[in-house]
Amino acid sequence: MTRIPFELKGKTVFVAGHRGMVGSALVRRLAAEDVELLTLARSEVDLRDQAAVNRWFAANRPQAVFLAAAKVGGIVANNTLRAEFLYDNLAIATNLIHAAHVNTCEKLMFFGSSCIYPKLAPQPLREDSMLTGALEPTNEPYAIAKIVGIKMVETYRSQYGCDFISVMPTNLYGRGDNYHPEYSHVVAALIRRFHEAKALGARNVVVWEIGRAHV
């Protein structure tokens, strides 16, 4: 079957999470396209509030949605804010995906994460490895929320015929990343640690692996 690419030209496009690394990159890219670009600040609408999200969708009628909004962080953040990572990310994903369906969005792309795969999944990772084993404990709440989002996309596509898809970026870094010493992702954290070590002339660098510090 030949797949027909979705044409964004002339569409109203909503980037959820436009201030994050992925979302801001999408905004920069879409700025060069013939689209009506919609973004939404946290102060305007709490994406964890289903009623507020539904009202915004009904008023703005986005035709395409890039769902890059999420509460994210590194090992320390995932370990210490487990309830927040689960609740916030579940609410964001379920609210936006359902609102997109209710308001007949033509296309939605949900950004997953490589942490959805089992800790001991065979390498290289395969898509069908999801839900075949235990998750990495340090980011299990975040991973569970992402899995729910992926499954919502699958089920809304199969039951309602929604043109919703998921993509799985892995170890992203770049412009707009978070380089906080405790709450950043692995690549950004390593860049900061090695940069600071070189600047200070340090002989050793402390790095984290499954929640334990190594020198």
Predicted regions, residues:
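Conserved Rossmann-fold NAD(P)-dependent oxidoreductase catalytic core, especially the SDR/UDP-sugar
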Residues: 94-139, 165
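SDR active-site strand-loop-helix element
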Residues: 16, 40, 65-71, 108-114, ...
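Adenosine-cofactor binding site in Rossmann-like domains, unifying the SAM/SAH pocket
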Residues: 31-56
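NAD(P)-dependent short-chain dehydrogenase/reductase
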Residues: 120-129, 151-214
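Active-site helix of classical SDR
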Residues: 141, 145-148
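N-terminal Rossmann NAD(P)H-binding glycine-rich loop of SDR-like oxidoreductase domains
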Residues: 4-30
